[in-house]
Amino acid sequence: MNKTTEYIDALLLSEREKAALPKTDIRAVHQALDAEHRTYSREDDSPQGSVKARLEHAWPDSLAKGQLIKDDEGRDQLQAMPKATRSSMFPDPWRTNPVGRFWDRLRGRDVTPRYVSRLTKEEQASEQKWRTVGTIRRYILLILTLAQTVVATWYMKTILPYQGWALINPMDMVGQDIWVSFMQLLPYMLQTGILILFAVLFCWVSAGFWTALMGFLQLLIGRDKYSISASTVGDEPLNPEHRTALIMPICNEDVSRVFAGLRATWESVKATGNAAHFDVYILSDSYNPDICVAEQKAWMELIAEVQGEGQIFYRRRRRRMKRKSGNIDDFCRRWGNQYSYMVVLDADSVMSGECLSGLVRLMEANPNAGIIQSSPKASGMDTLYARCQQFATRVYGPLFTAGLHFWQLGESHYWGHNAIIRVKPFIEHCALAPLPGEGSFAGSILSHDFVEAALMRRAGWGVWIAYDLPGSYEELPPNLLDELKRDRRWCHGNLMNFRLFLVKGMHPVHRAVFLTGVMSYLSAPLWFMFLALSTALQVVHALTEPQYFLQPRQLFPVWPQWRPELAIALFASTMVLLFLPKLLSIMLIWCKGTKEYGGFWRVTLSLLLEVLFSVLLAPVRMLFHTVFVVSAFLGWEVVWNSPQRDDDSTPWGEAFMRHGSQLLLGLVWAVGMAWLDLRFLFWLAPIVFSLILSPFVSVISSRSTVGLRTKRWKLFLIPEEYSPPQVLVDTDKYLEMNRRRILDDGFMHAVFNPSLNALATAMATARHRASKVLEIARDRHVEQALNETPEKLNRDRRLVLLSDPVTMARLHYRVWNAPERYSSWVNHYQSLVLNPQALQGRTSSAR
């Protein structure tokens, strides 16, 4: 069998069609496949003529009429996106300095923002009621939180051992020895720091407690006068004039999972009969060449299998500006004005057609809503860690989400995905300028979702949480270390966002959102400092002689005190604030039925195990978050390169590398406290022993085998596992199917496989006009690539080749026409483990 015969056999043609092709040489095959009989001055350009034929034979059901077009040079191009109709989307510069704004106002240079006159008087009057109610509620929350914090802080002050606060007079210490003065002041300085940190942390815990409590009451009553979901009955026909884009920004994601969830979502939309109102946009920022090719292939298969021609689009950006927010902005500039709304999906998002249609109905019923955020439920993971987190978010999450809605109403959160956005105001007001200055807190905004919600609200549009709308799902990280990688990004992003706290026009609620975003991570170093100061105070108490007399003519000594009964009472009160929301959550399930959670005893046992698990993980997260916060402030780059693994489990080596310092700190802390005062070790035991056990908990909780065992025992069971919704059943089915036909080593297949090469050539975006300089550059790229082994061809050079239709055609021709000359490429390709199902194309995979 010669090379030409081998090439013909690799084509997805019938035996009769293969027999009709010439067997003389590769060029003749491409000329025979070219229905237009084009001639090329260069022999290695001949594959460009057969692109259309190779595509049509490989994916006959994926190509809509008119989707294959000609570029300016007459080359076949697969039009993966609709025609762009550009909109202007530009950001207002951030004015973060109130002093500078005041000075500009004095000089008559104050700039009136674009958002000032958005609402008419009639619109303001129609919304005044819920805004007034929201303001009153938030004042009540503030009073409750501060009152509770003041009482607890005063109580904390009374149980500290050194009570000579009133006797300290700095003037009396002027003439005495510096060391004596320092030793007199040291316990009180430590206690002052402890009190300040306690007040801040208790206030943070108190706010969460009142949020969960109000959420519990909302869900228990079952009626919410101000719920945005109450504005529709749920079966109104959608307005055909208002079309919705489902956009999914992705970047080097699991291709099988992305397209499985997307297919299940789209089929659910079709089942509602509302598919004509929606289009899908896959917006790729992937820069791994193998994943890029796999995405293109998966897109073609998806279109064929759901008949999505002309409604499901794919685009890969060559210039990845501003990450996810820049990807969404690019969509809005090019295609946004073709749609009234857009729903942003994450790579792991799954949404039912009823949920998506419901979000559109809510938008149409509330013309002043800018963003409506659904409440996604976590599901789909099998590791012990993920199942425990799924259970926690499913049981406790509804309380906190309903509580957030109770306090915030139409001035709420946006979490960046599983939400519907009104496109026009988003384009006009939500473009993000880079933060001014230099350093780690300047430049492109990382956590864009909170900022976009704040800008939407600043422009007068409502931001709502539809906390009671079912059908929205997501996945959680499979293990602790993967969650911490995500937290590292979120930590930096939330710290950056706090620079916008004083920006002009921001609503007070969204200033509070910026503050709570910071506290989500800043609370970790504050808690660590609180523990460190408490330990230092115990060291001072144990190793130094107390200063009984703090004034020169003091008549009675000040005795250090230890009142364990009061300390236990305060500790118990704090634990109530921390754990009562969990108890309220389980009580709500007890009231409404425990069957979907495994029954009364199993859900109760699951709750107790989750509490134990959260106690073990809290100190570990505290130390990691402390490192993230300190690194962000110091401008350090936290490098976190995990080894490649075949499943979600954490290897023992990586666990000890990540948690080794925590284990050592826990051991030193425990031994030191046991030597000083065994009673104090009792108070620190949940902290230090959690740190000592951290590597073991991290590894064991990452195992799918352990998680699946708890699933068989019906522990950590959630309703989505007990009675899976159809959209999740379909996601699992399509995920299994996609993994059977997964395409690995996509770039090499795009060079060698005729069908995938035609797809890569047709979808390449670097379509320049012909020029001598360009031809020289193309020849250089191709020659340099082929003269090296494929293993030495780095990612960036592969991307350059993949982006140019001419270079891909020439690579394809040369490796097939002269396999002896390019034996390193041929041998490497033949050494790959090929998945036959991945190379069968639409003609076989659809059967």
Curated annotation (Swiss-Prot):
Residue spans, topological domain Periplasmic: 157-193, 535-567, 626-679
GO molecular function, one term: hexosyltransferase activity
GO biological process, one term: glucan biosynthetic process
Broadest EC class assigned to this enzyme: transferase
Cytoplasmic topological domain residue ranges: 1-138, 217-511, 591-602, 703-847
Membrane topology term: Multi-pass membrane protein
EC annotation from Swiss-Prot or TrEMBL: 2.4.1.-
Transmembrane region(s): 139-156, 194-216, 512-534, 568-590, 603-625, 680-702
InterPro entries given in the database record: Glucans_biosynth_gluTrFase_H, Glyco_trans_2-like, Glycosyltr_2/OpgH_subfam, Nucleotide-diphossugar_trans
An annotated GO cellular component: plasma membrane
This protein's pathway: Glycan metabolism; osmoregulated periplasmic glucan (OPG) biosynthesis
Record key words, sorted: Cell inner membrane, Cell membrane, Glycosyltransferase, Membrane, Transferase, Transmembrane, Transmembrane helix
Subcellular location: Cell inner membrane
One of the Pfam families matching this protein, by short name: Glycos_transf_2
Function summary: Involved in the biosynthesis of osmoregulated periplasmic glucans (OPGs).
Family statement drawn from the similarity comment of this UniProt entry: Belongs to the glycosyltransferase 2 family. OpgH subfamily.
Name by which UniProt lists this protein: Glucans biosynthesis glucosyltransferase H
